[in-house]
């Protein structure tokens, strides 16, 4: 089954969970950064950056994603500011088609409110949940520790293989030790 190509400006922004799944090198990071731009700038009720949850697999991927989201928001803000200025500015040479289409959809006179939303998203980007699966689970447990019946210093197990090895070792010693007594 062949799927149609992903269109970053065509994905519905209705409330709910979205999964973007693709092979390595297919543009997932680019697509996610553009979707974040759309989520904080479009619709009747654009989201605040801290309302988003963006989850990936590795710390490096999460850091790269945060950086690419920041760059995408900066690109869009620069385009809006240029469009708000006098004259008809020439588009930058590195303007990609999804961003050009997004800008065209904003109309001939993008609002100052839209620029303000993007500026606020950039200023508050450090509050965004752009993390790994492990980081998301850790934060969720910490935020919900009391409701889950856990202490405030709850932590996820990082060395699971080592811990299993220690348990097997301890069990083995107890069983062998009993057999020789």
Regions found by a protein language model. Name each.
Residues 1-149:
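P-loop NTPase Walker
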Residues 55, 154-161:
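Conserved phosphate/pyrophosphate-binding and hydrolysis machinery centered on Walker-type P-loop NTPases
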Residues 69-72, 167-174:
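Conserved AAA+ ATPase "sensor/coupling" helix adjacent to the nucleotide-binding pocket
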Residues 179-181:
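Conserved small/polar residues in nucleotide/adenosyl-binding loops
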């Amino acid at each position: 089954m062949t799927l149609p190509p992903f269109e970053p400006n065509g994905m519905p922004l209705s409330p709910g969970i979205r999964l973007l799944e693709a092979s390595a090198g297919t543009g997932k990071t680019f697509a996610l950064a553009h979707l974040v731009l759309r989520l904080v700038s479009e619709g009747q009720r654009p989201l605040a950056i801290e309302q988003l949850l963006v989850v990936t697999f590795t710390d490096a991927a999460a850091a790269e994603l945060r950086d690419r989201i920041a760059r995408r928001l900066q690109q869009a803000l620069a385009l809006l500011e240029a469009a708000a200025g006098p004259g008809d500015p020439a588009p930058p040479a590195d303007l990609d088609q999804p961003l050009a289409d997004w800008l065209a959809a904003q109309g001939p006179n993008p609002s100052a409110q839209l620029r303000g939303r993007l500026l606020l998203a950039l200023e508050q980007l450090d509050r965004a949940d752009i993390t790994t699966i492990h980081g998301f689970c850790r934060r969720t447990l910490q935020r919900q520790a009391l409701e889950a019946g856990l202490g405030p210093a709850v932590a996820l197990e990082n060395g699971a293989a080592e811990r299993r090895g220690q348990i097997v070792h301890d069990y083995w010693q107890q069983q062998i030790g009993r057999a020789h007594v």
